[in-house]
């Protein structure tokens, strides 16, 4: 009876060995649903170039997460993450130079009304009174460190009307982020290349709602889009995030790419950084240059002690395990659970 609520029973939990592994195949799944909150409000904020402001903002977000105010986490993007979903690389203004010059980056950011860093989060409360108190806490925590902080209530969602157009637009899957794959592409522009990002201006008041994305014209393979992700897990504090950001800025610039960075809270104490390398595959040598840059990022993150949240098929060729008995134990488990080696051979360092 309680199997779907407490499936572990007595003894070791085996769940973890099937996470990001090739030790088994999922055949059954149970989804836990939660009651609709009585009050929902979204907020958006932006931060300038100051490293101290970035540190203080991240430390404040960590405290809000630890205290339970931000139970659903937050999203935090640098300007390039948003710009790449709103427009192409400004080739004419840059005079063909890559990566994007700092002065032009600031100018494009100013025209778009963006901060150097831009974030959003959601408050879930029992009722409006509880929500007002949580808003006060968020304002007092973030207000002193950010350039802009706005709130937007979603009356339809707070009233439990999950079928309203605004709620459906907010919750529906979107391919808008695919636009960043076209950042360096000079031709074959998809019809929806000019659009407002979900974390762009006005994101606090119904962010993402009412934005129309027509992805039918996008074909990344046909259009020669190159896109590589690196996703290290970072301690959620300003010092470590700043080290990671500085590393990305230095490595990408030295290889001719922009530092396209996003931070996604993966818990109360950690954040996943998503670093994107976008390039034009039709340019000779770009594939190789992007791979070299990716390898350099992965090596730097490993040296700093930031493990990958997800591994690309390229990264799976090399082991990133610590120098302990983990690899040997995993190999024995693999041999026991999949003696013929038929499940995703060569993946996940097994």
Predicted features along the sequence, with ranges:
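Glycine-rich, charged/polar anion/phosphate-binding loops
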Residues: 1-4, 9-18, 28-30, 101-107, ...
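FAD-binding subdomain of flavoenzyme oxidoreductases
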Residues: 1-66
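Short, flexible, solvent-exposed loop/turn segments with mixed acidic/basic and small polar residues
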Residues: 29-38, 104-114, 218-222, 266
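Short beta-strand-to-loop capping motifs
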Residues: 45-50, 120-129, 231-238, 277-281
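Short, conserved charged micro-motifs
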Residues: 51-57, 126-136, 239-243, 283-290
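Short amphipathic alpha-helix segments
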Residues: 57-101, 240-256, 293-294
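Conserved glycine-rich FAD pyrophosphate-binding loop
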Residues: 112, 141-350
